Amino acid sequence: MKRIAAFTLYCLLIFPNIAQADNVIEFDDLLYAPDDSLRSKQLSGVEVMGEREWRENGIINCIPTKSERRLSNSPASLIKTMHLTYLKEKDGAIVNLMGEVVPVFINGKRASQIDLETFWPKEVKRVQYLEHPADPRYEGASAVVNFIMPEYKVGGVTRVNLFQRFPNNGYYTAASKLVRNNWTYGLMVRGNYERDHLTSQTGKTEYRDFFYKNQKYETLTRTENRHGYSRENGVQTAWNARYVTDKTTISHDLSFGWNENPGSGSLSQDVWSDNLFDASHATERHTAKSLSPQIYGLYYFKFSDKWFLSNSWKYAYAENTTSAFSQIGKNTPILNGTNEKVNSLKIVVMPSFIPSKKWFFQLYTTASLDWFSTCYTGSANLRQKQARQDVTASFKMGWYPNDDFGLTLEPGMAASFWKIGQEKQHTVIPTMNASASWSPSKKVYLRGRLGLYMRPASPSESNPVLLQNSELMWSLGNPNLKNLTSWDTYIYSSYLVTKWLSLSYGLGYVKTKNEIITTYRPASFEQGGLVKELVNPLHSEDRVMANISIDGSFFNDNLSVSISPEWSFVHVQGARYDKFHHVTFSGSIDYKLKDVEMGISYKGPYKDIDESGMRKTWRQGAWGASITYGNGNLYLSFQAENIFSKRNKRWEQFTSPYYSSRFDFREKGRAFTVNLTYTFGYGKKVDRSIDISGPSDAKTSVLHGE
């Protein structure tokens, strides 16, 4: 920690000595209005934060440079190249200072999968960041990033993206859309695959106080050296038709998804204590397929300047099949299979009332209904039916007396109902979210948030089917699980020290009750072995997180440096009482030279403790390097991941009364990626704000094994 503090102090002292002249932005890039015309209003009510950033009507605006647009091929990569204080790129997503993923909007319309696949950074005129926006087009989101792009009447845009990692996975996407007057039509096709034959693990497992074949075992140890392999293929398509006027939006999507695991598994070399199994190896194999057509409708109506209505619905059907094989030596194999059909329906209704610029009111209601019918074969021969309904309702009130201060309050309720066979359960709990924002000066921004979060048990977690996964292990869900609840508190701030240096700070506290954790207990005398099941612990878990981000831009904004130390503390009082501290560090350096950008990055090691203190994990840090070329239409990026480690290392340790394990994993480490994107437009004008949803992940109630 002392080294991090010293390094931070050094950065603060040395940066002023190497700062260079201000960046020059072309006149054509300045202050575009939403319709892409130049602003004619005066700067009254506009708070300038930096040379290309300003706050107006509670919205933070930023203009990307020409170089930043060219060296990007997605919303997240554009945010990364812009090096903003209040938004960051993380694992291909955009996150705010609290670490929350921020949804992407384009010209005030939510960007779905096809929007992202046809996103053209070259056309971005302005980036806006809004928190708790009153505009009902933002669907009641707590924070959004909105990209202002030109809207045209007639034309189209086509984008092709090829991503390949060596070794050994890739995805390939082609998307296009056509605009004619008020109508927009879109089409997307995407394929992906993955092959991993490089994962291995070594370690030891202890089973305690169990029966097996009429004999009681106090302790049994298995030492293993396992080599695993995994494979996956997938295809997704989406079609869209949308009609838009100033007061109405009507959009319908049809999508289709197919995924398969053609065969994955592992082969291990084992040593058993007491020579329980006359075998030196074990084999596991499994396959899976999922097929899911989906249809989605979105509607927006503006009745007046004060009354609005947004609603949507989505229906999805899925067929999921799985098979599993487990064998120790020449023992009788353990076989399992499932054939599942799923029907899902979700409805969202959000009326809004905006009486003035200072006040807004939103009623947000959702209803989700899922029906599962699953046929189990193998260790469990039965057909199970499960029905679930989740209903939420909240009333959001916002008060913004001026651009520098705002308050929101959102009380609500969440109810869950489910029926599994003849067993019924339900829960109803209150929810609450509150936030406050304050900008004491043009360089300082403060925000705080308090929320009561609820998550019901998933269909697979509440599944009461008992499955035998291996010779000594069974799995069992729990239909009596309580809803996970947590109090989340965050305070964060951003500070623009100078035009070339900015700081951001974050502090969070989360208290979790009824966490859903994994435990083990002895199986019955007839079954033998152990049963892995899910329970709610008696005690809570407390987490405290703090982070600092230092961002600097030098040499006419061509050199960018980012430094981010993080600290976390976990206090668990569940099955195992424990306290845990962890400090890590990440950073990056990027240099732009006309249409080329070169960069190096470092992501520090990671430690965590969860499962009520029973599970501890560690992962090593990694260095990366990249070089990117872009000219507006063509984007080409080469990256080297984990450049100093041929294999990525991590370990996992689990400790409980009846089952304990410790494994060291060696996974895919050093890898090289190529990302090629080509985008072109045609016709007079192009509208890139189409809302098309690709197929989301298919739901399943199937109980997960080991």
Where are the model-predicted features located?
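Bacterial Sec-dependent N-terminal signal peptides
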Residues: M1-V24, L43, T248-I250, W307, ...
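Short acidic/polar hinge/loop motifs at secondary-structure boundaries
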Residues: P75, H83, G108-A134, S176
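N-terminal periplasmic accessory domains that precede
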Residues: G45-M49, S72-L78, A93-V95, I114, ...
